């Protein structure tokens, strides 16, 4: 059986966004106390088209380029290219779409939404395993080898009714659903392709849904908490 997880109070920290000039710029140094720019090595092997996602683990950067080179590339923190992870193509061990990735326990997990598969690699890019998913999703996170969190939308999962109307669900290593989170009331949401709704930082998984002023945390036990509320001075997202 699976559980429906209620949201409880967490830090409840309010972030005051301040006044933004829609005709001006939002400068990073006004929002962050530290900003570091890294020039990535530019060789034929290391070129990246668009940076869609970056994860930093153990003095290395892992850069996702979903549409140009369709790959995850590994660099040092100084920007030196190390290796590519994953292989785009039509073969049985290749990705047809590099939708998302995460890093867990010295493994890189690449999600292929098109095939509903997870490709598991070593940090050096050696393929270890391919797992078939019974549902479709557009983001993933792995707390441990037996604890996954997935993010998806209804449009792709009418064949899997137990997760319909939920944005998030938690499974074991066999992808049996244990918890369902972030309920979406029927007729009161839109099926849109959201990007980077899940993000991990300092061993905590965060969830931010589109057009919301609230950032939630999700624990390995499936507890979901309000953590941060963005004060937009009476305006609504995405105003």
Where are the regions a protein language model picked out?
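Eukaryotic scaffold repeat domains enriched in small/polar residues
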Residues: 1-239
């Amino acid at each position: 059986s699976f559980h429906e997880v209620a949201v409880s109070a967490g830090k409840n920290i309010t972030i005051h966004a301040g006044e933004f000039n829609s005709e001006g710029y939002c400068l990073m140094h006004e929002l962050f106390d530290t900003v570091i720019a890294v020039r990535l090595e530019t060789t034929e092997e290391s070129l990246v088209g668009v940076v869609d996602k970056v994860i930093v683990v153990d003095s290395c950067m892992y850069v996702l380029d979903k549409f140009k080179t369709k790959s995850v590339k590994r660099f040092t923190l100084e920007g030196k290219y190390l290796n590519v992870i994953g292989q785009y193509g039509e073969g049985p061990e290749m990705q047809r779409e590099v939708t998302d990735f995460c890093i867990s326990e010295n493994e890189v997990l690449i999600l292929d939404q098109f095939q509903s598969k997870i490709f598991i690699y070593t940090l050096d890019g050696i393929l270890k395993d391919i797992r078939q998913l019974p549902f479709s999703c557009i983001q993933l996170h792995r707390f441990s080898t037996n604890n996954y969190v997935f993010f998806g939308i209804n449009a792709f999962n009418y064949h899997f009714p137990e997760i319909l109307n939920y944005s998030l669900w938690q499974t074991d290593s066999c992808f049996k659903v244990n918890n369902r989170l972030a309920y979406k009331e029927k007729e009161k949401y839109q099926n849109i392709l959201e990007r980077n709704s899940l993000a991990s930082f300092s061993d905590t998984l965060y969830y931010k849904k589109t057009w919301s002023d609230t950032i939630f945390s999700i624990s390995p036990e499936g507890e979901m908490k309000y953590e941060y509320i963005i004060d937009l001075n009476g305006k609504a997202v995405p105003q």
